[in-house]
Amino acid sequence: MHDFHMPDTAPPSGKTHPLVARLTTEFGWPRLENAHDLREFTTRPGAHCLFVPGDAARNLETPDAAVVLPELRQAFQNAFDCAVVGDGIETELRETTRVLKTPSFLFFRDGDFLGGIEKIRDWDDYIARTSHILAAKG
């Protein structure tokens, strides 16, 4: 008897999932690899959303979130710019913001943390939460 084994489509741990990589290659979003990059990006004028992907090999929601964020940005008529958080600063950033689950979207304005959205949600929930976060003074 042969056991059927479904191939794992997620990249091995430590590799960037193609849908996450697309955010930097196709959309041109910066990848923040250190505290300097993070500070420089989040202190720019305006609103910013950081995508914290987590490990796509262990978290099957990561590719979905990588598809949702560009759509969310478009729904808000580019009211915020976006960046992808690199592995080197992910843990510290999650602990600092207290948004611990991944994937997550972390919103900043002029260097101030406004709030975060953890895990995959219904579209209406994304719209409501993002509206609430962007309305915050910071």
From Swiss-Prot:
Pfam families: HyaE (PF07449). Gene3D superfamilies: Glutaredoxin. It comes from the Bacteria. Belongs to the HupG/HyaE family. This is Hydrogenase expression/formation protein HupG. It comes from Rhodobacter capsulatus (Rhodopseudomonas capsulata).
